[in-house]
Amino acid sequence: KAADEASSFKQECAELKSKTEKLVGLLRQAARASSDLYERPTCRIIDDTEQVLDKALSLVLKCRANGLMKRVFTIIPAAAFRKMSSQLENSIGDVSWLLRVSASGDDRDDEYLGLPPIAANEPILCLIWEQIAILYTGSLENRSDAAASLVSLARDNDRYGKLIIEEGGVGPLLKLLKEGKMEGQENAAKAIGLLGRDPESVEHMIHAGVCTVFAKILKEGPMKVQAVTAWAVSELAANYPKCQDLFAQHNIIRLLVSHLAFETIQEHSKYAIASHKATSIHAVVMASSNNSTVKVAVDEDHQSQISHPMGNQTPNQMHNVVTSTMAMNGGVKLPQKLGNNHVRSNSQGNVKQFHHIYYQPQQNGSMSGVNMKGRELEDPATKAYMKAMAARALWHLAKGNSSICRSITESRALLCFAVLLEKGSDDVQFNSAMALMEITAVAERDTDLRRSAFKPNSHACKLVVDQLLKIIEKADSELLIPCIKAIGNLARTFRATETRMIAPLVKLLDEREAEVSKEAAIALTKFACTDNYLHLDHSKAIITAGGAKHLIQLVYFGEQIVQLRALVLLCYIALHVPDSEELAQAEVLTVLEWASKQSYMTQDETIDTLLQEAKSRLELYQSRGSRGFH
């Protein structure tokens, strides 16, 4: 109407009117489809369009000025109409794109939607909007592809991940994870794991209901999706430790332990061991062991006294008994190859198969609420990946959290970790070692947890320690450092007579890698420090194993990160066993006197105090000894 009443620039006003009518027609379409429009770009586009229409109206109203004086004082540059025409064109393009991108899967064309003018300065934003819109309205196949695109974007750049969250991508990703086909679910789980890179992002996902969806998938989803979901749990827990308890409240700890236990250890009946198979295995085991008793743990998940399913059989004996019996009964085929690390050949070409307790699930059984249907038919690589990701998730959930560590240790997880440390694939072994390292670190600080979970007479604890020591004795694995730390964390749980872990740790003091020597020194310090009730016994064991000479070498010639750790350990040994003949012969007092003159070694007040005490004790006892000898 204002354009029709214009008294100047009539042609330009008519052009603006034509474009405005076209824009209004598009806005009416948008209003009719408002419930289907993707909210984030809709808000921005409608706000911009409203401003453009206000400016267009203001410009046209100026052209209605009547009278010479009004026209003189109302100066309208010709460029203003060109600029306004361009802005209206942009708004038409934006609203047209919004209608296309918000169309349902059936109405959407497969052709490229183009770049809306509003996103010209930030084209990646347009791509994110487009993919999220597909997640809202596309077919399941298109939604899967859109999730894969978001995975690629989130992996490439942290800022893109932030944009995906800000533009409302979490909700439709969770919906796809819950309702999509397997490939779409995998892509959605990957995207969620990649998006949870900082506390704010994870908190946003928690509010969006990620815990509930993850619990549902870990209970009922396909194993491949469950494995990626377990990985996503580990990512979220690693980047926002405050979400650990929320995951625990949704039963995720128990579900992860169930995945870890599947085909790993013989379980209570709730873990679905077929009774007729168990009976036949039991009979053969009893005959094989010359009528000795094989005690199988049947505790509930929340009891801590656990007996190993192998009883008093060696692992290889148990493996032979179980696999041969099940092969005879037609329960399962003997495994040929389970991933890269399940079958290894030695130089003579003989094949050593890692023992693995297989069993036939009951038809209607369920494993702690996990859907068992078809799980035994999954390929070995998927099963191994599932275990690796379950262990990884438990590792990050356990870190620094006493209540979760208690839940884990009261379940079958310790037995699982012990078995998987020996025979799992590389990833499974590493994640199991890291989980044990974190659980033992919490137990070191939490007396109640340490006493309940790592009692000296606990069969599960013994098995864990055995496996940790095997890895430490081999000393050629990436598992070495987490295993050293785990043994050090358990230093207060060992009896005075149990010194078998000292010698392997002392041997590592002579390791070429500084990091290994440092961790070995830290672990031994936990045995020899005053806080350890058995510090005297452990200090003597370190001396007997030849620790003094290695420590002297490290204090004199080690890298700086090792020197201080070695000095602290040497001080504790000198403090507790000052009358040792070995220390006197090794001239430890001379070493301590030299160290006390090195400024960088005495900067720490605690170390300086310990050093002076150790020197005083050695001087006192060794001066007495010298008088006795002469």
Please provide the spans of the model-predicted regions:
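Alpha-helical solenoid repeats of the armadillo/HEAT superfamily
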Residues: K1, K10-K22, I45-K55, K62-A65, ...
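N-terminal "cap/leader" segments of large eukaryotic alpha-helical scaffolds
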Residues: K1-S8, P77-R155, G339-L377, K615-H630
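Short, charged/polar, low-complexity loop and linker segments
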Residues: K1-S7, V24-P41, L61, A65-F73, ...
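Buried hydrophobic core positions in alpha-solenoid tandem helical repeats
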Residues: E130-I132, P172-L174, M205, V213-K216, ...
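Eukaryotic intrinsically disordered, low-complexity regions
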Residues: P117-G196, E203, H207, A215, ...
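Intrinsically disordered, low-complexity acidic Ser/Thr-rich regulatory segments
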Residues: Q303, M310-A393
